[in-house]
Amino acid sequence: RIAPGRGFNFSDGKQPLAMARKSLTEMADLLNLQSAAETHLAQYEDFIRSMKPRFVKRGARPLLLTTLIDPRHMLVFGPNSLFQEILDEYGIPNAWQGETNFWGSTAVSIDRLAAYKDVDVLCFDHDNSKDMDALMATPLWQAMPFVRAGRFQRVPAVWFYGATLSAMHFVRVLDNAIGG
């Protein structure tokens, strides 16, 4: 035995940000850092609230959040992902309403994305330019409705399985891509 341990839940499979805030508070109580946690959570809430006006004029076009796995597959993020509470707060519909795993994502073949016509698509980069270039050179990709309409953007990486700091980074990335 080295030291006592304590686990904290990352997600309940439904609302990871709500669970992260709860776990942060529990950890702060255990470490007697309640004030620091309260300060951080207040800053988080203020930041999220302050950014909301940036998305008011965006309209109701659904947003598909993705990241490339390989030239034939993407990971898509659905309703129980880290990003959903932010999308809900800002009134941005999540285009992916299909199946997801516990983490709110699922791997899909590229051809499944052809069904998404009137959507904005953001793809989180993660040092995969070679694979992305290979995908973007294919006729299948070039025929995607959102590609032809100029509504596909590569954006900086966001830690999909993070907590409040990742959510704040996501909001900054989202603002740079589709905010107003």
Segment roles from a protein language model:
Residues R6-F8, L63-T66, A95, V121-F124, ...:
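Structural recognition of the beta-strand scaffold that forms the well-ordered cores
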Residues Q15, M19-K22, Y116-G180:
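Structured C-terminal subdomain patch of bacterial secreted/periplasmic proteins
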Residues L75-T106, W159:
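Alpha-helical, coiled-coil/dimerization segments enriched in small aliphatic residues
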Residues A107-D118:
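Short helices/loops that flank or line small-molecule/ion binding pockets
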